[in-house]
């Protein structure tokens, strides 16, 4: 098996001086390909290993590649945009399987977000809406994550705190974060409420 680029060309094996030196010192073994999320010298969990290149008995890296079935692509590899703030970063990590859900929930509770609102003249309560079969209260982590148009003609956005979401969102409803982006995250209102309790 040889990994492919986005346009289906074979990906060449690593050819850096460090990779060649590792291969020279470790003939007959494997050279791990690591997700770029992890820096040099960091401890890498199993899910951060893309796979491994075979090193032959002469200490040369071959074109043979063994894929790691447990690999999880990081936000960068998935093409997520650069996080606009700490909550955005936490959401991206959770969606990619790199972050703890509980930490993102706690951060949402302590953050101010933008909430989709109904047309002018409607009450200012949290609005439960449906888009593409997904129902919930739609919130956005920052101005950078807002859609170009309101979710409903005449609608807009307003700021809300995570604690307001926890206290006002009805049971059985999801808080849907950044629905228009690649890192979409859903949190049940009951879970947010439970996390807000002292």
PLM regions and their residue ranges:
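An interfacial alpha-helical scaffold signature
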Residues: 1-198
